[in-house]
C-alpha cells in the first residue's frame, strides 16, 4: 500500500506490483481516488484521449522542448496532456509553461485534489500570465489542451 495518490501509478509501488505479478501472486487493486482521473474530470478537457507523462525533464532546454512536443500533440491529436512536478518546482513549471506554450493553449492546474484547499482552474496560457497561484508546497497536476 502506498501512502498517497493512486498506488503504482506515477508511484514506486509499480515495482512491487511487477514483482508480485512475476511471482504469480494475486494483485488486488482497491478503489480510491486517482488525482490523474479526477483532474481530467474537472478540467473540461478531452477525457476520451489523454496521456500522462509523469515528470518532465528538469533541464530548461529539454523541458522547453518537451512542453512544445506535448502542445503539438494537443493540437495534432486532440489529446489532453498531463504531467506532474515536485511541489517545490511547481512555480518554475508554471513559468516554463507560460513561456513555451501558445497564448490560446489551455492550462488546467489541479492542486491538492480531494484535500482541504483544493484548487482546480482552467485558463488559457494568456490568462494565467500575471495570475500564478502560490503552489510551492502542494502536489499539482498540470494539463494542457486546446
Across the structure, where does each feature detected by a protein language model lie?
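General beta-strand structural signal in soluble alpha/beta enzymes
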Residues: 2, 29-32, 83, 109
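Short, small-residue-enriched loops and turns at beta-alpha junctions
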Residues: 6-8, 58-60, 117
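Class I SAM-dependent methyltransferase SAM-binding "motif I" and its flanking Rossmann-like core
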Residues: 11-73
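A contiguous loop/helix-start segment that scaffolds small-molecule binding in enzyme catalytic cores
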Residues: 76-146
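Generic anion/oxyanion-binding catalytic loop in active/binding sites
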Residues: 5, 28, 79
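Fold-independent oxyanion-binding glycine-rich loops
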Residues: 3-4, 33, 55, 111-113, ...
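Short glycine-rich anion-binding loops that position phosphate/pyrophosphate groups of nucleotides
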Residues: 3-7, 87-89
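Short glycine-/acidic-enriched loop or helix-start segments at secondary-structure transitions
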Residues: 9-11, 39, 93-94, 119
Amino acid at each position: 500500500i502506498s501512502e498517497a495518490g493512486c498506488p503504482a501509478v506515477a508511484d514506486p509501488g509499480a515495482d512491487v506490483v511487477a514483482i508480485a505479478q512475476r511471482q504469480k501472486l494475486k494483485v488486488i487493486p482497491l478503489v480510491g481516488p486517482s488525482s490523474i482521473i479526477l483532474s481530467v474530470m474537472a478540467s473540461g478537457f478531452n477525457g476520451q484521449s489523454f496521456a500522462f507523462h509523469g515528470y518532465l525533464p528538469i533541464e530548461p532546454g529539454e523541458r522547453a522542448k518537451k512542453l512544445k512536443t506535448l502542445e503539438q500533440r494537443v493540437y495534432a491529436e486532440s489529446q489532453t496532456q498531463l504531467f506532474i512536478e515536485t511541489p517545490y518546482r511547481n512555480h518554475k513549471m508554471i513559468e516554463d509553461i507560460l513561456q513555451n506554450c501558445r497564448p490560446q493553449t489551455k492550462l488546467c492546474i489541479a492542486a491538492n485534489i480531494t484535500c482541504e484547499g483544493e484548487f482546480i482552474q482552467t485558463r488559457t496560457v494568456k490568462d494565467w500570465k500575471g495570475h500564478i497561484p502560490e503552489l510551492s508546497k502542494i502536489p499539482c497536476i498540470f494539463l494542457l489542451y486546446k
